Amino acid sequence: GLKVSCSVSAHHLTLIDDELDFFDSKVKVTPPLRTKSDTKALLKGLKDGVIDVITSDHNPIDIEHKKLEFSLAKDGTIGLESLFGTVNSVLDIETTIKALTINPRAIFGQESITIEKDTVANLTLFNPEGISVFSKENILSTSKNSAFTGKELKGKVYGIFANKKLVLN
């Protein structure tokens, strides 16, 4: 049979159209945000295994193209830095990890990662129960257009080790 995979962005899992100020261009994304029942269906699809992967849909837009009248502003929001906390706020940790790491590797035919003696491990240190507020001051991306600015997220990242170096602390 034909191999098919399905993904959804973190902001489509967590943001609901009628709860937001739609004249705020930070939430202008493509496809547009939908209803609470749509979001519930997406979450069910993840839990049931119909949806395989959650993406950041990281689409940085410079301030000149976001600080326009809503209809003229470009679509897009950054999503990489808020991804874990956003998703972990609405899903259990097992589903979160599977959709962010295990399933994407499987889809692309990559082996599962294991931690073994005498091998280099790339790790993210996090507390799945930790709470943090996603603030504009802490955004590392050049673009600051996040739909999650000021929101409380569940899951605090303390650091990332890659190729024997601490790359985020």
For each feature predicted by the language model, list its residue ranges:
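Low-complexity, flexible helical/coil segments
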Residues: 16-24, 38-47, 88-94, 153-165
